[in-house]
Amino acid sequence: MDELAAIGPIRYVIAPNKSHHLFFLPFMNASPSAEGFIAAGLELKRPDLQGFAQIPSEAPWGSELQGFFVDGLPILNETVWFHAATGTLILTDLLFCFSRTNRGLTALVSTILGVNGKLGMSRTMKFATKDRRALARSVAPLLTLPVQRVIVAHDQIIDEEPMAKLAEAFAWVR
């Protein structure tokens, strides 16, 4: 928390999807002046979070960090983020990219999921997609952004040819 405080005050704490929420309350407790927002539907999974607002479409941080709700994948209800100043697209579980240098269980699982050595949607997320057209509509705006870097929550950061890799990752849905 000291490293974050050195950057500046924490004004918002976000649970970006229905899977990434375990440290939401500890962060809120450590940042008493911050506002907390949760993914749509997370309050059903975590009744202790019912007092928090859902991530708004018009967010107070929108001038710095633009959010895009991803429809069609209700198991996640993920919002992804674009930081225009750096051209960075930030994703949690919508896409994965595990390094081919990983070994053991990580290499095995990422290979089975189809995300070993490439940016892509895991086979489990493809299977969990409930509305492919809605998902396609949701990701279409992402492919028009001036993305210079893709940060995924699991393993690799994509600095080389991020737009081409995004297009390839979402080709199955178009």
Question: Residue locations for each model-derived region?
Answer:
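Short, well-ordered alpha-helical scaffold segments within catalytic/effector domains
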Residues: 1, 21, 132-136
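Metal-centered catalytic cores of metalloenzymes
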Residues: 1-2, 34, 95, 174
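Active-site HxH/HxHxD metal-binding segment of metal-dependent hydrolases
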Residues: 2-61
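Short His-Asn-centered micro-motif
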Residues: 14-18, 38-40, 70, 84, ...
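Generic serine detector
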Residues: 19, 31-33, 57, 63, ...
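Phenylalanine-focused residue identity feature
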Residues: 23-27, 37, 52, 68-69, ...
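Metallo-beta-lactamase
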Residues: 37-173
